[in-house]
Amino acid sequence: DKLICLSIGMGLSVNETNSVLKIAGLSPLYPKIKRDSIIIINMNNNRSVVEINEALYNEGEDTLN
């Protein structure tokens, strides 16, 4: 979650974020996972971490830490 937050703060795209996650040895964002899908959609719409957390919370998903 920390790397996703940093990526959003840096204005990285979803593809760039997935590259960062892979380099760190973590799973990339996967659109068939509900939480990841919410993050991807909001990143594509240039939403902030706060806005993404609100969307995650509203859908009953864990927020970004």
Outline where the language-model segments fall.
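Short amphipathic recognition helices of helix-turn-helix/homeodomain-type DNA-binding modules
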Residues: 16-49, 53, 57-65
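Histidine kinase transmitter module recognition
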Residues: 9-12, 44
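Short, basic-rich loop-to-helix N-cap that marks the start of a DNA-contacting helix
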Residues: 1-10
